[in-house]
UniProtKB/Swiss-Prot annotation:
This is Gibberellin 2-beta-dioxygenase 2. Its EC number is 1.14.11.13. Its cofactor is Fe(2+). The keyword Metal-binding applies. Belongs to the iron/ascorbate-dependent oxidoreductase family. GA2OX subfamily. It holds the Pfam family 2OG-FeII_Oxy. It comes from the Eukaryota. Gene3D superfamilies: B-lactam Antibiotic, Isopenicillin N Synthase, Chain. InterPro entries: DIOX_N, IPNS-like_FE2OG_OXY, IPNS-like_sf, Iron_ascorbate_oxido_reductase, Oxoglu/Fe-dep_dioxygenase_dom. GO terms for molecular function: gibberellin 2-beta-dioxygenase activity; metal ion binding. Residues 186-306 form the Fe2OG dioxygenase domain. The keyword Ribosomal protein does not apply. One of its GO terms (biological process) is gibberellin catabolic process. It comes from Oryza sativa subsp. japonica (Rice).
């Protein structure tokens, strides 16, 4: 079910009554309750598809429970990640530098962004994982590959389930069109593992403030949106993830709300490509990670992406006389090239606003290859 909230997004006339009772973020005092979706569909698949579509339209983010990913698969991924990050720095560097794949520390991208973290980025294909595995787990690279591949397969299935539900909830003529983008054999999906050690900067702030909250939280990973189609995140029980609510972002406010950790759940958020594909109906939410002085935070994110040649353009069902095309057509490769020239916090989609003479709406690729 979706956690009730005070206000609902626009969901179409048929869904208006349901949207009024089930909105996106429930405000309780100064806190915010993240929308929760039970993926086991206790009220039926039709209601589940509407719930997922409402959550992604209103906030671009939800907590998925009863998601079907086996706990043993998640536990094995956690153990493999922890075993890597506990290694000596020189040993971890053998899996780097991040170009953009591999091991990295503090530096995020090539444009000056830094954070209080270390990370490992892998392409989500078995062959790509195998090529890096010997530098990550020299004792048993095949074991590491198997753990990552099992995890990727389970989380990819969850991502596909979400995208199929979105296709149904949005009323697409072909509800599987979004899923086919990330299941193409040459998809560009990634797996990213972030490790945030307790922050010395935050500890210094605690000391200066007499043990109270640090005046300025240490930034583990700065403000950004995810560029791909969909992100599926799981983390341990350390907090740190924060969201910038869409209404606050539109008003130019910087009101960040914390997301309570839940290691048993997955957190799903809309990426830039999905916002473009749905002509802005679904929202790519801005988020960041702050680091405290408590326990380390370990998170694993599956970034579901299409092939590099995939053509990203608003789906026909999302364009109408009252809802003109917001973004011009582009390929994922073009979007990535632009992304690599910008700082982390840049609103990348602003550079792809539609102009006169853009092509027809649709989703596909440059050479009709899937």
């Amino acid at each position: 079910m979706v956690v009730p909230a005070a206000a609902a997004p626009e969901c179409g006339r048929r869904e208006a009554a349901a949207a009024a009772a089930a909105a996106v973020f429930c405000r309780r005092g100064r806190g915010v309750v993240v929308p929760t979706v039970d993926m086991s569909a206790p009220a039926g698949r039709g209601e589940l598809s509407r719930q997922v579509a409402r959550a992604c339209a209103g906030s671009g983010f939800f907590r998925a429970v009863n998601h079907g990913v086996p706990p043993r698969v998640s536990a094995a991924m956690d153990a493999a990640a922890a075993a890597f990050f506990v290694r000596a720095g020189a040993e971890k560097q053998l899996a780097g530098p991040p170009d953009p794949l591999g091991y990295g520390s503090r530096s995020i991208g090539a444009n000056g962004d830094v954070g209080e973290l270390e990370y490992l980025i892998l392409h989500a294909s078995p062959d790509a994982v195998a090529r890096k595995a010997s530098a990550i787990d020299r004792e048993d690279p095949r074991r590491f590959s198997q753990v990552v591949n099992d995890y990727v397969e389970a989380v990819r299935q969850l991502a596909c389930h979400v995208l199929d539900l979105l296709g149904e909830g949005l009323g697409l003529r072909d509800p599987t069109s979004l899923t086919r983008l990330i299941t193409a054999t040459d998809n560009d999906s990634l797996i990213r593992i972030n490790h945030y050690p307790p922050s010395c900067a935050a500890a210094a702030g605690d000391h200066k403030s007499g043990g109270g909250p640090a005046p300025t939280a240490a930034i583990g990973f700065g403000e950004h949106t995810d560029p791909q189609i969909l992100s599926v995140l799981r983390a341990n029980d350390a907090d740190g993830l924060q969201l910038l609510l869409p209404d606050a972002a539109a008003a130019g406010d910087s009101v960040w709300v914390p997301v309570p950790p839940d290691p048993s759940a997955f957190f799903v958020n809309v990426g830039d490509l999905l916002q473009a594909l749905t002509n802005g109906r679904l929202v790519s939410i801005r988020h960041r990670v702050v680091v405290g002085t408590g326990k380390p935070r370990l998170s694993t994110i599956y970034f579901a992406a299409p092939p590099l040649h995939a053509r990203i353009s608003a789906l026909p069902e999302t364009v109408a006389a009252g809802a003109p095309r917001r973004y011009r057509a582009f390929t994922w490769a073009e979007y990535k090239r632009t992304m690599y020239t910008l700082r982390l916090s840049h609103n990348r989609l602003d550079l792809f606003h539609a102009g006169d003479g853009d092509g027809d709406a649709g989703v596909g690729d440059d050479d009709d290859h899937e």
